[in-house]
Amino acid sequence: MRFHHFWPPNDIYFGVGAAGIIEEVSLITNDRNYLFVNLNRYSLLNALNFFTRMSDINKIIVIISSSRLMPLARFWLTECKNVIAVFDAATSVQDIIRNVSQHQSGEKILTEQRDYRFRINRKDIVKMKYFLSESGMEELQDRFMNSSSTMYRWRKELAVKFGVREPRYLLLPDSVTLL
């Protein structure tokens, strides 16, 4: 896989913004080895696969996440050594530049910590992949060897962690998915 400075590669506007941030940061730190990841409802399915194959990437990763997917971004911040920071999409460009340019090698950038009632874990990521990939309940029952009631409970628990009715609502605009 070849990456320049932003992901997903088809998000041109995000790429232009990421290039501007990298340009400003490089003037301060002389480092251009950054990869900015845009985590939102459009990139969610691909991001689940991207972060499982991330060991090939030798770049410093900064995630810009929508508010709804912030628990997932925080999970990747703690689990992936390449990920150094997570910013909400509403964070100003100047704040991102300031925080990234002050980054010390080997440290994570801690931004405002909104307290999330639920933490995402590895099992949730696996479940999310299956629930969002349009797998039917019977297929999921066979794969996980569990009853339908267990599958429905898992789906409900995952939805509650993200504040939606069903996991598939994570792929819809925020105004449609409110509880």
Curated annotation (Swiss-Prot):
GO terms for biological process: capsule polysaccharide biosynthetic process; regulation of DNA-templated transcription. Pathway: Glycan metabolism; Vi-antigen biosynthesis; Capsule biogenesis; capsule polysaccharide biosynthesis. NCBIfam families: PRK15183.1. This is Vi polysaccharide biosynthesis protein TviA.
